[in-house]
Amino acid sequence: MSETKITYDDFNPHAFETLDITDETKGAREVIRWAYDVYGDSIIYSCSFGAEGMILIDLISSVKKDAEIVFLDTNLHFQETYDLIDRVKARYPELNIKLKQPSLTLEEQADQVAPALWKQDPNQCCYIRKIKPLEEVLSGATAWVSGLRREQSPSRQATNFINKDERFKSVKVCPLIHWTWDDVWDYIKAHDLHYNELHDFNFPSIGCIPCTEAVSGNGDSRAGRWTNSTKTECGLHTTNKP
């Protein structure tokens, strides 16, 4: 694997096409090691603290113990998510875990934009509470890590290990692209990792309270998000603006 730094302006889409993905982590450990060796302090992991996030935190901490981990705190998350963050902080005390707040409180958003904006215009709500905060976080970074997997949804099937991120004009590193949902849980159980307790109650994907529901039956691992809506992404991984 090349030690050359890949940037947004000097992007090489073919850098990892020959990577061996037959190891336990399907290439994830090697991609993470490369990313932190090359980018150092100029790479940030934006973590939602979902199941995939627990794996990435575990792998990242083995490479860079003081890595910067940012949680986009919309002020609309489940208490179980905040409890998980506290448990993760206790297990990995050297990690630099930060909670990034939006510029508007929920009360200010209701007054200045609309009450319960997530009902009237969920794209705008995600833009204010997630996309803009991440833009601020990444303003000084060259690259960021994401837990996207190809299996998660049709919109994510073309994701590569290294991606030119047009939304944030950055490089997006996605170490888990080849993992299945079973792979995720096999690793969590094998390494006795913490995870959000809502996963035990039929929540495969966990976001903000108003936009997340438990699911019944089989579906992709994004099921339960924005139910009865055509919306499938918060916007962090698309180039469309609200």
From Swiss-Prot:
<dbReference type="GO" id="GO:0005737">
    <property type="term" value="C:cytoplasm"/>
</dbReference>
<feature type="binding site">
    <location>
        <position position="211"/>
    </location>
    <ligand>
        <name>[4Fe-4S] cluster</name>
    </ligand>
</feature>
<dbReference type="GO" id="GO:0070814">
    <property type="term" value="P:hydrogen sulfide biosynthetic process"/>
</dbReference>
<dbReference type="GO" id="GO:0051539">
    <property type="term" value="F:4 iron, 4 sulfur cluster binding"/>
</dbReference>
<feature type="binding site">
    <location>
        <position position="126"/>
    </location>
    <ligand>
        <name>[4Fe-4S] cluster</name>
    </ligand>
</feature>
<protein>
    <recommendedName>
        <fullName>Adenosine 5'-phosphosulfate reductase</fullName>
        <ecNumber>1.8.4.10</ecNumber>
    </recommendedName>
</protein>
<keyword id="KW-0479">Metal-binding</keyword>
<comment type="pathway">
    <text>Sulfur metabolism; hydrogen sulfide biosynthesis; sulfite from sulfate.</text>
</comment>
<dbReference type="GO" id="GO:0046872">
    <property type="term" value="F:metal ion binding"/>
</dbReference>
<keyword id="KW-0408">Iron</keyword>
<dbReference type="InterPro" id="IPR014729">
    <property type="entry name" value="Rossmann-like_a/b/a_fold"/>
</dbReference>
<comment type="similarity">
    <text>Belongs to the PAPS reductase family. CysH subfamily.</text>
</comment>
<feature type="binding site">
    <location>
        <position position="125"/>
    </location>
    <ligand>
        <name>[4Fe-4S] cluster</name>
    </ligand>
</feature>
<comment type="function">
    <text>Catalyzes the formation of sulfite from adenosine 5'-phosphosulfate (APS) using thioredoxin as an electron donor.</text>
</comment>
<keyword id="KW-0963">Cytoplasm</keyword>
<dbReference type="GO" id="GO:0043866">
    <property type="term" value="F:adenylyl-sulfate reductase (thioredoxin) activity"/>
</dbReference>
<dbReference type="InterPro" id="IPR004511">
    <property type="entry name" value="PAPS/APS_Rdtase"/>
</dbReference>
<keyword id="KW-0560">Oxidoreductase</keyword>
<dbReference type="GO" id="GO:0004604">
    <property type="term" value="F:phosphoadenylyl-sulfate reductase (thioredoxin) activity"/>
</dbReference>
<dbReference type="InterPro" id="IPR002500">
    <property type="entry name" value="PAPS_reduct_dom"/>
</dbReference>
<keyword id="KW-0411">Iron-sulfur</keyword>
<dbReference type="GO" id="GO:0019379">
    <property type="term" value="P:sulfate assimilation, phosphoadenylyl sulfate reduction by phosphoadenylyl-sulfate reductase (thioredoxin)"/>
</dbReference>
<dbReference type="Pfam" id="PF01507">
    <property type="entry name" value="PAPS_reduct"/>
</dbReference>
<feature type="active site" description="Nucleophile; cysteine thiosulfonate intermediate">
    <location>
        <position position="234"/>
    </location>
</feature>
<feature type="binding site">
    <location>
        <position position="208"/>
    </location>
    <ligand>
        <name>[4Fe-4S] cluster</name>
    </ligand>
</feature>
